[in-house]
């Protein structure tokens, strides 16, 4: 087995007293599978890419939020103008008396959902705090580490307030149409999605919404939905014993032959080849 790449805190933190830092990815390039000896929060600002976390693929774009534990293995591939920020931290160095474990899924290797979404309002507020955190964590002045940790605590609580699961934007949310569209797409894995119906319900222009989506994500709406479904199919092929025809249905493809064509085009191998190759990892 190939040696697992591991990123070390000595290469990313200014001192062994620093608990928090910000690592920009403008843009994020393809990055091989790796682990760390620190943890990170990942927030995607725009563009798209394939994020594989613990063998589960996610097609990511603006608003995606991940909580990554040190032992998690992840990689980035098929990136397209993918812009994100990593807020990296060492749990053992945090000194503030906050309920870190309650606010950060997977904190100290506890069980927790790693993937969430942020709407435009949450993203705007997070970006402001991250800007302050990035500035403070790069300072070499008294109490810079303490100030950075205070800002990190603020960011963690802010994310806790605004995050939601990818397919369930709160009904009372005042988020933008783009946020609501991405949520609706994530909830349409098995069922057909009709953009014209969505636009009628939202009283918006289909043409304008298509333009906004492509500008922010680097993909068309159909491309995004297709790739989200393929990612789900990859996961089911590796981690379930469902027949390929049943997986096709679970992922919104009425015709299993068409599913195979799309899957092969997106991944470079047939569903059965993918299953055989990846079953060897389990």
Curated annotation (Swiss-Prot):
Secretion signal, residue range per the UniProt entry: none
Domain of life: Bacteria
Gene Ontology cellular component list: cytoplasm
Localization per record: Cytoplasm
InterPro entries xref list: AraC-bd, Homeodomain-like_sf, HTH_AraC, HTH_AraC-typ_CS, RhaR_RhaS-like_N, RmlC-like_jellyroll, RmlC_Cupin_sf, Tscrpt_act_RhaR
Further remarks about this protein from its record: Its activity is regulated by L-rhamnose. When this sugar becomes available to the cell, basal-level RhaR binds L-rhamnose and becomes activated.
Name of the protein in question: HTH-type transcriptional activator RhaR
Origin organism lineage: Bacteria, Pseudomonadati, Pseudomonadota, Gammaproteobacteria, Enterobacterales
